[in-house]
Amino acid sequence: MGLGYLCAWRATEANGIAMMWAMIILVSIGTGFFKGNVSGINGRLFPLADQDELDTVFNLQYMFVNIGSFCGTTFLSLIGTNAGYRTMFLVCGIFLFIDCVWWFVGMKSFGDAGKKPFLVDNRSENVEKADKEKDNAPLTKLEKNRVIAILIVTVFSGIFWLIWYMAYMPVYYEFGPVSQGGSGWANWNIGSFEMPTAWFDSMNGLLCIILCPIFAGIWAKMRQRPQGDWGMFTKTAIGIIILGLCTGSMVLAAALSGQGTKDPVGIWVIILASVCMSLGEVIFSPLGNAFISKYAPKKLLGTMLGVWPLIIFFSGKAYGPLYNWLGNFDFVKAYGVVTIIIVACGVIMLAFTKKFDKMVEGK
């Protein structure tokens, strides 16, 4: 990833297209090697007996990820606007090389986690038994059901991320201030200060930093109840429904502003949209890696952890065309339908949570 950003740093008018594609390819490959395996190692740092702690662990991991997101959108964006984007890419590359050194120095603290490929179930066995483990046995019926359950959660998470990413577009281009390229449906002023639209990204990162440890505590408390914590499917469904409140708030704000024909609505719509997006995200997204670490068959762990970011990639590719297509229709009607569909997806998943839970528990 660091090499990718250095390619962008060296981009010129003559080689810019090639260097930017080099950056995209290298960063994508680096992310593929890095992201899923880091989550796998984090999952293996905790023994099988403490698997319920994984929800808390991955909530905290998600918090630190969003510290990076918040700092990047808040501070690195200032480097881009003041010193140029090539300088910003150079700084990104330097940080990643520092991170690489930090990783190698800190590897000794991982113990046995990550020393062997995820073919051995060292969640419950000593890693020294790795070479003796037979990994060519077919999947059991329970393992197949768990793979299906993981894929179901992943598909619904893809729906969530598709709408989540797309929600940024009306915030910027319909509700954004005219001075920043928007249509001015909302007033971004705080007193005499006009909030930069880039801070909407920062707001999400900041809210995730605040909410992740809070929800980690909530899940820990809920596990102590006689009925236990909510399952992954319930949390995913609730996260999707809350995201529906985000698009619903935009529909209300668009109607109040007359879609630009009346006075702009207050900044409340921006804040409410960000809160709903962040709440929906924090309720289920950090737990995806925990869920996969708990239930993925040992020899498919790395692959299944890679499927999670893969579906996010497809959502990231699809939201732009979807936003452009919705632009052909009346905003209130189009996004009203989107709200109904996303809430319906959450309700459908909520209705089948018991069946899905039985699939992963083998009941």
What would you call each of these model-derived segments?
Residues M1-G16, I238-K262:
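C-terminal ends and interior cores of transmembrane alpha-helices
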Residues L78-I94, G228-T234, N324-V343:
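A membrane-interface helix-boundary motif in multi-pass transporters
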Residues G4-Y5, M23-I24, G93, D99-C100, ...:
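A generic transmembrane-helix signature of 12-TM secondary carrier transporters
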